[in-house]
């Protein structure tokens, strides 16, 4: 499972390890580093950001500066970050293109989720009992269920669940 590395779920734990589900130890969990992910997807072209401008060598330097025992840095973002949230004029594509060479210089490699869960053992369990989102600061569903109309629509939709399950087509 790929999910948000929200502070209210992790507590004191780091998102930079492989975890497993509290209810199913065979189900591995990879947690998004929201700060490093948002540095690209949200802040990259923000000239008011204290780290602006962001270059690939600087970004990889941040990752290389993390404690060596932290095994995995998960950077997840929506594809819309490349060209929409971060316009092409911001040089976002040149930044992304430069990342592999900068990472190689620092001995940092890229891996798929499958490669990560195959290579690394889980260090602990994580319990994620509620839906999460990376859409807002709360890292929950409040941005979609934050007002009366949204909650009413949600509740109406789920009120027919029993009837939907009775259908056989």
Describe these PLM feature segments.
Residues 2-3, 77:
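Conserved beta-strand positions
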Residues 16-39, 45-50, 54-169:
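Active-site and substrate-binding clefts of carbohydrate-active enzymes
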Residues 4-17:
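Extended, H/D-rich, highly charged conserved domains that either
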């Amino acid at each position: 499972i790929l999910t948000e590395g929200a502070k209210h779920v992790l507590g004191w734990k780091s998102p930079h390890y492989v975890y497993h589900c509290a209810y199913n130890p065979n189900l591995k969990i990879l947690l998004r580093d929201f700060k490093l992910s948002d540095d690209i997807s949200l802040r990259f072209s923000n000239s008011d950001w204290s780290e602006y401008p962001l270059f690939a060598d600087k970004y990889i330097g941040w990752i290389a500066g993390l404690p060596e025992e932290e095994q995995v840095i998960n950077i997840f973002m929506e594809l819309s970050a490349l060209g929409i949230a971060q316009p092409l004029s911001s040089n976002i594509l040149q930044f992304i293109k430069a990342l592999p060479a900068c990472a190689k210089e620092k001995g940092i490699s890229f891996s798929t989720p499958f490669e990560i869960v195959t290579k690394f053992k889980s260090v602990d369990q994580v319990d994620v009992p509620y839906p999460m989102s990376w859409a807002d600061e709360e890292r929950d569903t409040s941005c979609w269920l934050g007002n009366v109309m949204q909650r009413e629509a949600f509740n109406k939709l789920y009120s027919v669940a029993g009837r939907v399950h009775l259908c056989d087509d």
